[in-house]
Amino acid sequence: MTNITNIGFFCQGIRVVKITDWLNWATFMETTTDQWAVVLPMIQRGSVWKPHQVIDLWDTILRGMPFGGLMASHIPAVSTLEFFHPLKRTLVNLPANGGLSLIDGQQRTLAMLIAWPAVDQQMQRRIWVDFGEDDNYDHLLRLHFTTESSPMGYQRGGPSGQAIGRLSLAERRLANATYADRMAAIRAAEPANSVKLRYLHDDEITPWHSTLALDLRLLIERHQEGAQALRTYVENQAQDAKVKLDARITLIKAKHVPFDAYDDALLEAIISHLRKRITTIEKCMGSSERATRIHVLEQGLERMTRQHFPVIEVPEHLMHAEEKDEKKDPPLAVLFKRIGTGGTDLKTSDYVFSVLKHLNPKCHSLVETQLKSTQISAIYTPTDLVMSAVRLVAAQIEPEKDQPKLDKAQFTRLLRDEKKFQRKTPKSPASLLNSTNKLGSMAHL
C-alpha cells in the first residue's frame, strides 16, 4: 500500500478529503497527524461570492450533495514561494508537511469558513439559520446572510440561483435607527478600523427580515458538543431573543439617547416591527415546527461530518513557471482565467495586483499599510489602490500618455520595460510605495 505522506499530499493526481479536515487545515488547526495548511497563492480574484451563492452552497452541504472538486498544488515547506492565510491578509510560513495552494475553490472554501467554529469572529460575513419560519422555495431551512456592508442582512431569499436583493433604503434607515445606540456604543469602545466588524458580530443584532435567526457558526459549535447541547442552545436563544426585543421596545419608549431625537412616526414604525417579531417568536415557541427545524439541522450537520470531496492536483511546476513569450501570460494566470470561465473571472485589476505580488511580495504589505487608514480604505479597495498607483508610475515613465483604463496588454508592455517600470516597482518597491503614499495624502484632503 502506498504511503501518501512519503510522496506528498496527492496520489495519482488526486486526493479525497473530508470537509471538516479541509476547514481545519484552512484555519491551521492541527486535529490529525496528517496536518496540512490550506493557503492562497499570490494570484487571486478580488471579488467575493454573492449572498445567494453562499446560501446555496450551505444548503448543498446540509443536504449531503456533492459540490464539485477543488484544485490545489502541494507546496513543500522549503519552497521559496510566498502565500496568504485564507482568513487574514498576512503572509504565512508553511508547516512541516507543506501547504496546499488553493487554485480553484477559494470562494467555496471561504464560504464554508464563514460558519466554522475555529474561525470565531474573524470573518466579515455571517450566515444564519431561522428557526422561526420555513423556506418557501427549495432550501432545507430558511437561511440569512449578513456582511460588514449589510449588517442588517438582505431581502428574503428566493429559489436556488436567484440573486437576493439588498434591503430597501427605507428598510435600511429603519433598521439602523432601531440599533443606533449599539453603533454609538461600539464606536466609543472600539478602534475605528474594527467598528464595522464588531457591529456585524454584535449580540443584539440579527437579520432585519428574520424571525428567530441564530448564527450557524455557533450552532455548529453546539452540535460538536452533542445533540442535546444544540437543542438546549436553540431553546435558550428563543427565550433570550424575546427578552431582548421586549427590552429594546422599553428602551425606545423611554426615549433615551439617541431615540429621544426620533419623531413619533419613526418610533411607531420601529416598535411595530419589533412587536411583530415577538409575536412570531411566541407562536414558534408554542408549536412543534421549531423542533422539526432543529432536527433537520442536526441531520444536515451529521451529513457534513461524513462528507468528502476531491482535490485535484495542479502540478507544482506551474506555480514557478514563467511564460517565455513576453506577450503571453504565465501558465498559472492562464489556468486561473480558464477555470474562471464557469465562475468568477480574473479581472484586470486582480491580475495586475497578483503579478506585482508574485514579482515582489512586499507590494502586498505596502498596500495593506495604506489601507489601515480608514480615510483611505473608505475610498480605495486594495485593487483600486494598486491600479491607481500603477497609473501614477506609468505616468512618470511616459508623462505624455495617460491610461485611464489600463488593460493587461498595456500592463504587460510596462513590465517588459525593465529599465523603467520593473526598476521602479518589482525590484525596488519604493516608487509604488511613493505612489500609494501620494494617493493616501489625497484621501486625507
State where each predicted segment sits:
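Positively charged N-terminal leader segments that act as targeting/secretion signals
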Residues: T2-N3
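A cross-family structural signal marking well-folded subdomains
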Residues: N6-C11, V17-W22, V352, P382-L445
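Basic- and aromatic-enriched surface patches that contact anionic nucleotides/nucleic acids
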Residues: F10-S47, W58-A395
